[in-house]
């Protein structure tokens, strides 16, 4: 059995828009614990009546869960099949409720995004002006502040090769 996993790291969600890397996994048990840990339940988004409908749905059979685990590359031995069956049932119920939800067709779908979609169209002249205007220091766009290929001294087939030891001691 492997003792360390040097290239596997935890991705921890700390209520921010950017994920952060946690410490490396040290054992296979840590990886299993992280993968099988419940993070969010679809029931949090359902009303009481929708949760009641959820209990009426059949639970996926054990054979189906085992096939899904094999397809996803997760271990079947030691897996909590009953918990996975409950989670799959909740997720299927949630998807069914989303499909059955009536939508208001009078709403414009382009406003259903986090960011506004009212972008002004750019002409060729606008693009040329922006390209020639240089970097905006207010947006932290400083010319020459970052060279993406500075650590790559070798090339092969038109690609730069960055050695891993150069990535460890970056400034």
Curated annotation (Swiss-Prot):
Entry-linked Pfam families: GatF (PF20977)
Gene Ontology cellular component list: glutamyl-tRNA(Gln) amidotransferase complex; mitochondrial inner membrane
Misc note: This protein may be expected to contain an N-terminal transit peptide but none has been predicted.
Keyword Nucleus in record: no
UniProt name for this protein: Glutamyl-tRNA(Gln) amidotransferase subunit F, mitochondrial
Cellular compartments annotated: Mitochondrion inner membrane
Subunit structure: Subunit of the heterotrimeric GatFAB amidotransferase (AdT) complex, composed of A, B and F subunits.
Main location: mitochondrion
GO biological process, alphabetically ordered: glutaminyl-tRNAGln biosynthesis via transamidation; mitochondrial translation
Organism listed in the record: Zygosaccharomyces rouxii (strain ATCC 2623 / CBS 732 / NBRC 1130 / NCYC 568 / NRRL Y-229)
Enzyme Commission code(s) on record: 6.3.5.-
Similarity remark: Belongs to the GatF family.
UniProt entry tagged with the keyword Ligase: yes
EC class: ligase
Bilayer disposition of the protein: Peripheral membrane protein
Record function comment: Allows the formation of correctly charged Gln-tRNA(Gln) through the transamidation of misacylated Glu-tRNA(Gln) in the mitochondria. The reaction takes place in the presence of glutamine and ATP through an activated gamma-phospho-Glu-tRNA(Gln). Required for proper protein synthesis within the mitochondrion.
GO molecular function, one term: ATP binding
Catalytic activity reported: L-glutamyl-tRNA(Gln) + L-glutamine + ATP + H2O = L-glutaminyl-tRNA(Gln) + L-glutamate + ADP + phosphate + H(+)
InterPro entries in UniProt: GatF (IPR027499)
Keywords tagged on the record: ATP-binding, Ligase, Membrane, Mitochondrion, Mitochondrion inner membrane, Nucleotide-binding, Protein biosynthesis
